[in-house]
Each structure stands twice: as structure tokens, then as C-alpha cells.
Amino acid sequence: MATHSESPTKALPFADRPVEKAPGHWVLARAGKTVLRPGGLALSTWALKRAVLPGADVVEFAPGLGVTAAAIIGVGPASYVGVERDPNAATRVDAIASGVGRCVNADAAETGLPDESADVVVGEAMLSMQGEKA
């Protein structure tokens, strides 16, 4: 799986908020945990290899800082669309996806994408990011 190094000059999303007011996954990113992989890297790698990504139209929910987006793009999908609700993170992933795809600033529940526009949908850490209201 491809790796992606983060520029230290780019502020993380919600970096301006106190820890108690920032979403948990962005607090973890401040501490150096920039990728949420429930089940670990081995499970993520296993699942992505079996998803038949080369030549597919891929949508990824909550790509965060774009580490998995870079890995997906590295195997040659026909297209890639990230759906990220944080505008700073969406901008980062949009830059990573340029040339192959894009990242839209939207909620996974209302992406704005046409029905049946993806062959593969990736939601690597979606459930781990849901609050009590989910």
C-alpha cells in the first residue's frame, strides 16, 4: 500500500479548536495518529486488494488526510471521488486526487453524487467516527 507523508506546514483540520471541542479523530491526528484503520493496516490492505480497484469508479467516504486515497489512486482506478465533510481535509484530498479524481466537501449521508456512480465504495473508518447521535 502506498504511503503518504504529511507536510508539517499544513495545519490539521480543527487545529484551532481546543481538544475538548474537536472531533476525536482530529485530536488523534494532532497526536500523530493520522490514519484510522479499525482492524489495522493488514486488514485495510487485505480489503483494498480484494476490492478490484484497477479500472473501477471508486468513492471513498471520510478520506481524512488522504493516506488511503493515495493508495487507491496508486492502483489505477478509472476515477476516484472522496467525500469529506471537513473542508480543509477535502481540499487536501482534492490535491492528492488531482488528475484521477476529486474530493467533494459533503456528508456521506448526502454526497450529491448520482446514484450508481461507483463500482467500489470505501468507508474505512466511518463507524469509528460517529458520535452518540448516530
Which role does the model predict for each range below?
Residues M1-V27:
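N-terminal, positively charged/glycine-rich alpha-helical extensions of SAM-dependent methyltransferases
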Residues L65-T111:
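Class I SAM-dependent methyltransferase SAM/SAH-binding core
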Residues G55-G64:
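Conserved class I S-adenosyl-L-methionine
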Residues R37-P54:
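Conserved alpha-helix/loop element of class I SAM-dependent methyltransferases that forms part
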